[in-house]
Amino acid sequence: MPIDAKLLALAQRAAEAEGLDAALVCAVVEQESGWNPWAMRYEPAFFAKYVAPLYTNNKVGATEAYARGISWGLMQVMGQTAREKGASSLYLSTLCDPAVGLAVGCRILRQKLEAAGGDPARALLAWNGGANADYADEVLARVGRYR
């Protein structure tokens, strides 16, 4: 399936704005959403570990809590992570807006890369939560498609 040229250009610009390798960002997008800006996935284990305590302690309402337990958009940014990194829009579903989701996702990926000392494999493992040891290899194998 061909990639929408507008989405590709948006991804390249978002990567450039954060000083990231555009090919790496595009590979993450392909791995995470297959270039579907409307992709979303409820992550029950993430919800239970990171979000449920906020809801249980009345820090957030039910709708906000469940939205924080969903990965959204092209880069599949977790709602909770987006909130922690300053995404203050009223609705987390705005992460499905390609420009918004890519900007937030690239900012988070840059932070992960900095924390990993510039090592893309370690940054990708952190991006994915470390649960899938093959994730970084799968993404890095896709990078060449975007060079």
Tell where the protein language model's regions lie, with residue ranges:
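Catalytic glycan-binding domains that act on GlcNAc-containing polysaccharides
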Residues: 1-147
